[in-house]
Curated annotation (Swiss-Prot):
Pfam families: PRAI. Gene3D superfamilies: Aldolase class I. It comes from Allorhizobium ampelinum (strain ATCC BAA-846 / DSM 112012 / S4) (Agrobacterium vitis (strain S4)). This is N-(5'-phosphoribosyl)anthranilate isomerase. SUPFAM superfamilies: Ribulose-phoshate binding barrel (SSF51366). GO terms for biological process: L-tryptophan biosynthetic process. NCBIfam families: PRK01222.1-1. Coiled coil: none annotated. Pathway: Amino-acid biosynthesis; L-tryptophan biosynthesis; L-tryptophan from chorismate: step 3/5.
Amino acid sequence: MKPDVKICGLKTEEAVEKAVSLGATHVGFIFFEKSPRHIEPDIAGRIAEKARGRAKIVAVTVDADTDDLDDIVYLLKPDILQLHGHESPQQVLTIKALYGLPVMKVFSIREPADLLQIDAYIGIADRFLLDAKAPEGSDLPGGNGVTFDWRLLRDLDAEVDYMLSGGLNKDNVGQALAETAARGLDVSSGVESAPGVKDLERMDQFFAAVRLATATAPVSGSVQ
């Protein structure tokens, strides 16, 4: 089966419609003011209607407090909460109970030890997203356009359901699928002409590359 594909950091109706029409299974909206992809919850809620019922709507937060989460959930009505901060297993459980939504927990990877933290969240988070650790000095936990060594994932338990993120683009996504057991792909900067500006042609190219890769080397997919 084809992998899930999530286009993250969407800010316009045009980009949302394009993502869904190309076959995106997930569309992500980022609520983190330091990011060039940050969007206000009310605006996100309006443009997300283009995707509702056609793709999973994902709210991406970074150590958000309850008041902010309340606003995001109320205005966006997401299908999934993506936690990109330092949320503990107990915090993940609390958030799931509070909002009744599945959680995708993000981990930043650079070296083998970074994968060890996943164990504490198995059976708690509904899915994982494995991203490249941010470069030194970056204010952004993700969306930095850098990859990590995918060979690190070879020893990951095959039962771990994860999306692969970090520097994916049309030129490397085939290699990413060949080298990992990722059941999903998350792309943001790789389909942009500038930080926060989605490029419709690059989105076309990315999906074409995914189709080409999966036609020759199918992977198992999993839609949350």
